Amino acid sequence: MAKELSQEEVLDFLCQSGGKVANASLLVHFKRFLRDPQAADAVLLKRRDKFKRYINSVAVVRQEGSVKYVVLRNRYQDLLGEDIEPAAAEDAGSEGERDQVVLPTEHGQDYLAHTFGQERLKQANGGDVICDCSEARAVVPSAAPHSHSQSWDVGESMSEKARVNPSHWDTKRYYPEDPPVPDSLPVSPPCTNTRQSSFTSTSRPHNHSLSSNNLSSSFSSPESPGLVAKPYNASPSPAGSSPNIREQTPKSQSLSKAANAAFVSVTCTDIKEQREGCTELLAPQPCQNWDYSQPEQLHSAQEHHSDLHREHMTNGFHSPDPLSSKYPHLTSPCTPLQLSPETDTTPDVPLAHNLAAVSYPSPPLPGNNMYGMWMCQIPVFKSIRCQLSLQDLDDFVDQETCGSEESDSGEGGDCDTEPRDNDDADDDTFSSDSHKEIPKLCVEQESEYLHKCHSNIDYSGKNDLYNSLLEEDRIGVKDTLVEHGDVASMRIDTSKSVYTAKSFLTDQAPILFELVRNAPPNKTSSCFQGALSSSDEELLDRDYRKRRRSSRYKKSANVSVPCVQPDTDRLLTAKCVSSSSFLINNNLQEQSTQAQFLPKYNSNFGLKKSASQKSSVVPLDPKEHDWIVKTAAGLWIQVYGMFSMDPHLALHKDFITGYTALHWFAKHGCIDLFNKVVIGAKKAGIELDMNVKSSNGYTPLHIAAIHGHHKVAIMLVEKLKVNVKVRDNSGKRAWQYLNSATSGDVWQLLGAPKGKTIFASCALHTAQNLNIRNKTSSQLARKSSLAAFRKTQHQRRKANNQSFLREREIYSD
């Protein structure tokens, strides 16, 4: 039964039904909304109209016998099979235990939007708990073995780890005016490796809370690409502790809400699924004096989380510091997160770390701005790709990358994160306090733009870790350490990374940037385009982009700014590379980012330039051109000389009329050269098609009949055995083009029908002319002579009879 009447629900049901479902089954599935006895007639009518629009937008109705089926449209057929598959049931005794908790959001707040689609996480095991997107519930599946995981520790002490089960949930209801203070930081990583695995929350308020001491989440073994949560010192769950939460948590039993959350995109061990996970980390609850009016805390908190990740990636351990130095408003300390350096992959977004000595304190993070702080990469339906064309996608990425002209981000491809032209521009760093907007991502698009870090962080071993990731995934991420006095900054070159822009705050931006992965050939740096392009259209376009670019920002001339665009045929098609491409590539070897796209860009540009400047000119071989001109002009001596040197010229067609040399011979009536060319081609081993057609469908026999060259037609039929039944594009045969002066033998030779009345012979023409002359003379004699009126009636009748007998004799002959 459907839970809501929406486009996503209709598309989900059709995809789960294999793209084809009976009309009756579809109506039964949405019966709750279409035939609600408690709803008014007007509401039901609106629902029916809305339901019809939803169906017509994604499916069509087909009649098969007496049953009507609703069939998914072809553009959505690629969505079949992409729904989240049930996780395979695992034996709790052999595989251990695996805890996974999906925590609710704060009262009246959503961390994710409806536009990501309603997704369901299904678990096939009877002991597992179904997690629905409309109601945030806990999921407690089996755990992965402890020996194959590296853990992120969340808790104040390692000895107080406890397994989280439904029996630990608190039943007390809290409200925003009385925020609770939980003792742990629950973590909810995804467990599936499908592209649709995600945890989403809706606008419905959730009343769930967790009251366990500590919880830890860990990476699974390299064999399983997904992420699982695993506690230390996990105690076996009691009997009956893992039934469905839907049965254990009635309406009367509600759980408190977490005040804020942060979304971190975690890279899985599988390269193909490294950006599929989305981990929801909940910070501890604040005390009574929570302050929600501090938007400046976001940047400092992001740096705080980034420092932890860098410290863990370097040392593999940490020394926990109290949270009071960083967040004095909190009564419960924030437990650190641990990531072992032996892991093969690194999170896409840096995690958090607590620093004891900081120059300024940061207040706690409000929950209503968490969606803007962290990029949560949520997979959505591929119908976005079906609805957006390549041009729309290009425009969308341009808009998301550069923003509008009136915005403070400037214009141009590399104006997103450029530092302002102020006194601190020489430091190549920018402070997080200089921006009052939602903080930018830690992974920037350009290699020149740096993110400020604290000076007491060790960066040893950072390059080795990212180099291993670069060799495996080849996403083009390079790290360079730059130190300016007491400030160490990390610069990341993401020329091919999927995260190449700051504007990931929209709903579909993460999945769009993941789809396109590669830089397009037509989006290179301005100096590179200046070296290659020469057409007026591209020059005007480049000048227009320069005028639109804001003068407050500096332009980097040696860094290419790729605008993301799909390149799905890169491994399927092979494109020819001209020699000039290798010359340019040799001259620009030091520009590795630009040179790797140069051959493809140069070939496309060459084709575009030749098509625009020489659209009306078709290049021909000089010998072929001379052959066409000489055969059309009837220069038979030169034609036969060229044929003697290259007999294959007889096979060449005129690109306009489609005539071959045989057509020209038949048109000019050159029977001698016709015979010589045919005999010479046989000697050279070339088979000539005597029934070859021109652009209008004319064969040489048609051409000979049209121009009245009967000798050529007789030779073609008798000696060369051409097919007289071939028709041209008008549906006519060769004999239908013969004129009246053609003899009957030629008519019969070209296949004219025997019962067809052909033109009269000469004798018949003479007799008919004589008869007409006699009739005319007799009529003139009767009308013009006065003696005719004096003749008797018998004489006039006798004269008329004689003329009738004379006409009979003529026709009998």
Swiss-Prot record:
Domain of life: Eukaryota
Biased composition (Low complexity): 208-244
Keywords: ANK repeat, Repeat
InterPro entries (alphabetical): Ankyrin_rpt (IPR002110), Ankyrin_rpt-contain_sf (IPR036770)
Gene3D superfamilies reported in the protein's UniProt record: Ankyrin repeat-containing domain
Compositionally biased region (Pro residues): 177-189
Record flagged with keyword Nucleotide-binding: no
The keyword Coiled coil is annotated on this UniProt entry: no
Bias (Polar residues): 191-202, 245-256
Composition bias, Basic and acidic residues: 158-176
Family statement drawn from the similarity comment of this UniProt entry: Belongs to the SOWAH family.
Protein name, entry field: Ankyrin repeat domain-containing protein SOWAHB
Source organism per UniProt: Xenopus laevis (African clawed frog)
Lineage: Eukaryota, Metazoa, Chordata, Craniata, Vertebrata
